[in-house]
UniProtKB/Swiss-Prot annotation:
Keywords (A to Z) from UniProt: Hydrolase, Metal-binding, Metalloprotease, Mitochondrion, Protease, Transit peptide, Zinc
EC code: 3.4.24.64
UniProt organism field: Mus musculus
Record's subcellular location: Mitochondrion matrix
Pfam families: Peptidase_M16, Peptidase_M16_C
Cytoplasm as UniProt keyword: no
Activity regulation: Binding to PMPCA is required for catalytic activity.
Protein name in UniProt: Mitochondrial-processing peptidase subunit beta
Transit peptide, start-end: 1-45
Length: 489
């Protein structure tokens, strides 16, 4: 539901590139702009409902070719503008898996109008940043610049997605870069575990493949593959031009018409359908007793962005929460699981997640444990899941709802996260959901709703499990599945 909010609780699933001042820098996802509240300060779960004030309207216009233009003008001196494209690794097959990510790498390697050096110098002289990332269902290119440079930023974005040269020399050079990136990803155990989790949960489907693709594909992708991907997927109805900050919607609309009105023709045939991705309860275990800690993810099948149960699962996700040893401990932690984990010294950290795609999702927990506590930690996690289905209280749900709303609003801080929120929501829902509407949907969730929805998705369901490290004491899959069942009143 809250596309921007959800992404903060998810584990890494996108690969980004940031260009600014001619060097690459990592960019973490931030969130959107400050929001103002009326009424007294929120002091407890019984506090009066808050009213969001001074939220600029999100204006949306659709061009004749299907491209949607959406913007929010907050009067800042800077702006973020970008292209959100309904195309990612899920639209690939086994042979071309990795093409979307490869294409993202090629975006800033020169166009028919600008060499790579010219592009870097122009961005540097503007004091701007160019960014791109690929996820399983979306590809994004965006720029952050001064508001006065909005026309130049839009023109550059249009140039790089429509006129990239895709030179053979650049392709070969980037091939090596991606292979080195794959080696770096393999050292990030959290990403490795989540790739394993997708591979086992969505076996032999597009969501089960990695975003980077297998090594053999990276070594064989050629210019024709990249051009074919652009021709198939970079079409008007599948693209959103989103902007936030100091932007005028009418100006943005005219820029969109000028740069995209004729070039991005609409589909002559049907838009390629999303390949169905069936969830399979199963596991992947990679035992390595030389590793100091065990890394484990367990998840059940959840729902897509627009499903009515999404909000309730977000609240349940907040109820489970997250914890790290650096947080300290005590019985006043908001998460019951955090209290038990801290008191029993069961793990180094855990993080709940609710990953939503168009028509499916993963709801679960990622944990890092000592070898001796893996079984105990998993047992406590499953007991907490059971408690969500049977014994969660109204006060706990009220606290989780307030925490969820607070986190969502705190994430909306700046033009870049607002722009990301607009772009994602336009692709997911074809509109930007107003914050008051989202708050009302969260407020409608009560303890009975949480118990009912969690029972629907957790009770007697076979989970997907990915485990890496010293996992000798991890219970076998049948035992884990049996612990997903309990006697209900």
């Amino acid at each position: 539901m809250a596309a921007a909010a959800l992404s903060r609780t998810l584990l890494p699933e996108a690969r980004r590139r940031l260009w600014g001042f001619t060097r690459r820098l990592p960019l973490r996802r931030a969130a959107a702009q400050p929001l103002y509240f009326g009424g007294d300060r929120l002091r407890s779960t019984q506090a009066a409902p808050q009213v969001v004030l001074n939220v600029p309207e999100t204006q949306v216009t659709c061009l004749e070719n299907g491209l949607r233009v959406a913007s929010e003008n907050s009067g800042l001196s800077t702006c973020t503008v970008g292209l959100w494209i309904d195309a990612g690794s899920r639209y690939e097959n086994e042979k071309n898996n990795g093409t979307a990510h490869f294409l993202e790498h090629m975006a800033f390697k020169g166009t028919k109008k600008r060499s790579q050096l010219d592009l870097e110098l122009e961005i540097e002289n503007m004091g701007a940043h160019l960014n791109a990332y690929t996820s399983r269902e979306q590809t994004v290119y965006y720029a952050k610049a001064f508001s006065r440079d909005l026309p130049r930023a839009v023109e550059i974005l249009a140039d790089i997605i429509q006129n990239s040269t895709l030179g053979e020399a650049e392709i070969e050079r980037e091939r090596g870069v991606i292979l080195r990136e794959m080696q770096e990803v393999e050292t990030n155990l959290q990403e490795v575990v989540f790739d394993y989790l997708h591979a086992t949960a969505y076996q032999n489907t597009a969501l089960g493949r990695t975003i980077l693709g297998p090594t053999e594909n990276i070594k064989s992708i050629n210019r024709k593959d990249l051009v074919d991907y652009i021709t198939t997927h970079y079409k008007g109805p599948r693209i959103v031009l989103a902007a936030a900050g100091g932007v005028c919607h009418n100006e943005l609309l005219e820029l969109a018409k000028f740069h995209f009105g004729d070039s991005l023709c609409s589909h002559k045939g049907a838009i390629p359908a999303l390949p169905p991705c069936k969830f399979t309860g199963s596991e992947i275990r990679v035992r390595d007793d030389k590793m100091p800690l065990a890394h484990l993810a367990i998840a059940v099948e959840a729902v897509g962005w627009a499903h009515p149960d999404t909000i309730c699962l977000m609240v349940a996700n907040t109820l489970i929460g997250n914890w790290d040893r650096s947080f300290g401990g005590g019985m006043n932690l908001s998460s019951k699981l955090a209290q038990l984990t801290c008191h029993g010294n069961l793990c180094h950290s855990f993080q709940s997640f609710n990953t939503s795609y168009t028509d499916t999702g993963l709801w679960g927990l990622y944990m890092v444990c000592e070898q001796a506590t893996v079984a105990d930690m998993l047992h406590v996690v499953q007991n907490e899941w059971k408690r969500l289905c049977t014994d969660v209280t109204e006060s706990e749900v009220a606290r989780a709802k307030n925490l969820l709303k607070t986190n969502m609003l705190l994430q909306l801080d700046g033009s870049t996260p607002i722009c990301e929120d607009i772009g994602r929501q336009m692709l997911c829902y074809n509109r930007r959901i107003p914050i008051p509407e989202l708050e009302a949907r969260i407020d409608a969730v009560d303890a009975e709703t949480v118990r009912r929805v969690c029972t629907k998705y957790i009770h007697d369901k076979s989970p997907a499990i990915a485990a890496l490290g010293p996992i000798e004491r991890l219970p076998d899959f049948n035992q884990i599945c049996s612990n997903m069942r309990w006697i209900r009143d």
